[in-house]
């Protein structure tokens, strides 16, 4: 069976929709899936590790990487920058690993221009009230910041129709299964299977 190149997926969601929890659960179940570790200029939160959750860099360092064209995509969110390393993504895809980009709609637009075959998924919360409750339950942000995140959530959600798939994270296990189904379907496309089973197809067609 021939080695196939991995698939690239984008997961986007408003803050509090449960995207990070879904990604973490997905990676625990599937060793052949990885999430890209982004570069960011935002401050490190309690429990976060450099190189594991993000590559934490200064604004000057980030801008230097932009100048060197080292990013697959980058965007400014609130007062911070986020970017995805080209080299890291390409090496994982070449190794047959399915890679997830945890990025917003701005980054998704940039990636589509470079790689039109990318599959994009938007995660929705079950309601606006539930989204606000989840943000409050984090206990990380002030009410002013939460209000800002709610306004940003509305702006981000307005781009849902730019995505290939939309999943409502009402029941966590169901949402996780939905993502797995999308990934498995991509692995069974004609393009992927014709490479993976080239020897079989050749023998059957002789």
UniProtKB/Swiss-Prot annotation:
Gene name, per UniProt, is: gmk
Q: Which Gene3D superfamilies match?
A: Guanylate Kinase phosphate binding domain (3.30.63.10), P-loop containing nucleotide triphosphate hydrolases (3.40.50.300)
This protein's record includes keyword Cytoplasm: yes
This molecule's function is given as:
Essential for recycling GMP and indirectly, cGMP.
Q: Which Pfam families match?
A: Guanylate_kin (PF00625)
Q: Which reaction does it catalyse?
A: GMP + ATP = GDP + ADP
- The source's domain of life comes to Bacteria
Q: Subcellular location, in the record's words?
A: Cytoplasm
Q: What is this protein called?
A: Guanylate kinase
Task: Give the family from UniProt.
Answer: Belongs to the guanylate kinase family.
């Amino acid at each position: 069976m021939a080695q196939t190149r991995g698939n690239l997926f984008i997961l986007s969601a408003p803050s509090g929709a449960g995207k990070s929890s879904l990604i973490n659960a997905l990676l625990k179940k599937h060793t052949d899936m990885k999430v890209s570790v982004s570069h960011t200029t935002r401050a490190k939160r309690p429990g976060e590790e450099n190189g594991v959750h993000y590559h934490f860099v200064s604004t000057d360092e980030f801008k230097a990487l932009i100048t060197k064209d080292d990013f697959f995509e980058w965007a400014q969110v609130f007062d911070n920058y986020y970017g995805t390393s080209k080299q890291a993504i390409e090496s994982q895809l070449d190794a047959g690993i399915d890679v997830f980009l945890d990025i917003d709609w701005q980054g998704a637009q940039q990636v589509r221009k470079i790689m039109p075959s990318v599959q994009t998924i938007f995660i929705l919360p079950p309601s606006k009230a539930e989204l606000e409750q989840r943000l409050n339950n984090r206990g990380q942000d002030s009410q002013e910041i939460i209000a800002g995140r709610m306004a940003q959530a509305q702006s981000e959600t307005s781009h849902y129709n730019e995505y290939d798939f939309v999943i409502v994270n009402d029941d966590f296990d169901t949402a996780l299964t939905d993502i797995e189904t999308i990934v498995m379907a991509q692995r069974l496309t004609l393009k992927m299977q014709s490479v993976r089973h080239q020897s079989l197809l050749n023998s059957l067609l002789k």
